[in-house]
């Protein structure tokens, strides 16, 4: 009987690290494991321009993401000459907790490219890019892990741009799907 108890205790002690590591993997969603990660988000920029953004990159561990992407924000009808704003960017995102639900902070850097219609330049309508300006966009938010290695994110930030010697600040809200 003593041998059985000792064997059982030894087995439990040996299996404890395996059980603890399995539990940790369940707490961290699959989209935050080391390797490729991506997201697609609906955004509201300046509370006027609606759009989509996508970011693809590499998760170094469950806390650090580095990637790049493209945003496209479309103009409402009361900006008749403007088509939209396109933003190529690079992004760093920090996840503070190992849990599936965690606060986040991110920083994006890139260029805003505004596209306009100008019918008076040639015959027909001419589309060209104007107003290329660098930007930084710090944001805070929250990520929720879902089943099957997916997640949702909600972020609030401010886009800081420079355009012809002016500093422009624009609030930004995004709701995204992470994979």
Q: Where is each model-derived feature located?
A:
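A generic beta-sheet turn/junction motif
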Residues: 47, 96-100, 179
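Short alpha-helical segments used as structural interaction elements across diverse proteins
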Residues: 2-3, 20, 90, 105, ...
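Short glycine/proline- and aromatic-enriched beta-strand/turn motifs that initiate or cap beta-hairpins
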Residues: 22-60, 64-70, 178
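Short, exposed beta-strand-loop hairpins at the edges of beta-sheets
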Residues: 161-165
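Extracellular/luminal ectodomains and secreted, surface-exposed scaffolds of diverse proteins
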Residues: 158-160, 172
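Gram-negative (and chloroplast) outer-membrane scaffold detector with strong preference
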Residues: 42, 55-152, 156
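Outer-membrane beta-barrel "beta-signal"
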Residues: 92, 167-179
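Cleavable N-terminal export/targeting peptides
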Residues: 1-32
